[in-house]
Each structure stands twice: as structure tokens, then as C-alpha cells.
Amino acid sequence: MKSLVFCSVLLICGVLSAQNKDVFQSVNELVKETQRVISIEKGQVIDTAYFRTLFLPTAHFSMVGQEDGEFMQETMGLDEFLATLTDEYYSNGYHEAGMGAIVEEYNGMAQVIQSFEGMDSENETGKGVNSFQFVYSEGRWWIANMVWAMSYDNGKDIPRKYLKKN
């Protein structure tokens, strides 16, 4: 019986490992995985250890927005960003999903510009645009940087080309 349980556990771990490896072979799947990991229900926590594996250790995260009519940006490194994901703000849940995207790839580098919609822990909904930059190294895709901006009129200002499904 013990050997049956042990074999079952090994099989399950092997399947999960294979599924996770597939995520790193496609920039589209890597974007979806990023959003899957940060989308949590009330009472859940984001798996920041796994989230870290999606990104280069040197990745940067930048949010662009307007304040008093002036464009502003805030940029942080991977460790700083992971710390924000453990904030109490997320304790009531968070959800983000892609609406459409443009994917460009060349010679080991790629970019995905994606429109998204989300709902935060306070049930506020919003739409915006993410820009992911990728590099292919060590047999897989890595997210090198991520930049995002929120829409100011519930997505009506998002260019149509970013709303088209791949």
C-alpha cells in the first residue's frame, strides 16, 4: 500500500512538473500563468515563491499613470514587487484576466502588449494595458520586465488593436 501511495505521489508530481514546464515554452502561456498566480479568492495567498520563477531575478515592474495631469511612474524590483503581493490589500481576493493582446517575437526576445480587466480586494473593477518583455534563455522564456497602466474611462481609451484576441 505504501509503495502504491508513493508511486501515485511521484506520478502526480511528475505531471505537475511537466505542466509547469510547458508554461515556460510560450510567452502567451507565461502571461496567462502570471495572471493565474496573482488571481486569488478571499482567504488565499499568492504563491510568491512560484511567481518568482516566472521572472528574471533582475526583472523590473513599472506602473505608469497620471497625477495632476502629469505622467508619473513607479518602478520596483522583483523583491519589492513580491512584497506588495503579500500586502493585506490582497486578503479579500484579486482577479485579473487578459482581454486581448499583440505578441511580437524575434530571435530570443518577445513582447506582449495585453489589455486586461480586473477586480481588486475592494470589489473595484478596472481595465488597463500590460506590457511584458521576455527573453529566451536556458531553454525557456523569462519575463524580463512588466509595465502597466490603468484606463481612465473603463477601457474606452484602450486602442482596439490591444483588445483583439490572439
Where are these regions (language model features)?
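Bacterial Sec-dependent N-terminal signal peptides
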Residues: M1-F24
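Short, low-complexity N-terminal intrinsically disordered segments enriched in polar/charged residues
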Residues: A18-T53, L163-K165
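Surface-exposed, charged secondary-structure patches
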Residues: V23, F61, G65, E70-S121
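Hydrophobic pocket/interface hotspot
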Residues: T34, F51, A59, V112, ...
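Short beta-strand segments enriched in hydrophobic/aromatic residues
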Residues: I38, F55, F116-G118, V147-W148
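N-terminal, post-signal-peptide region of Sec/Tat-exported proteins
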Residues: K42-F71
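Short beta-strand edge/turn micro-motifs at domain boundaries
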Residues: V129-G155
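Short, low-complexity, Pro/Ser/Thr/Gly-rich segments in the mature regions of secreted, periplasmic
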Residues: Y152-N166
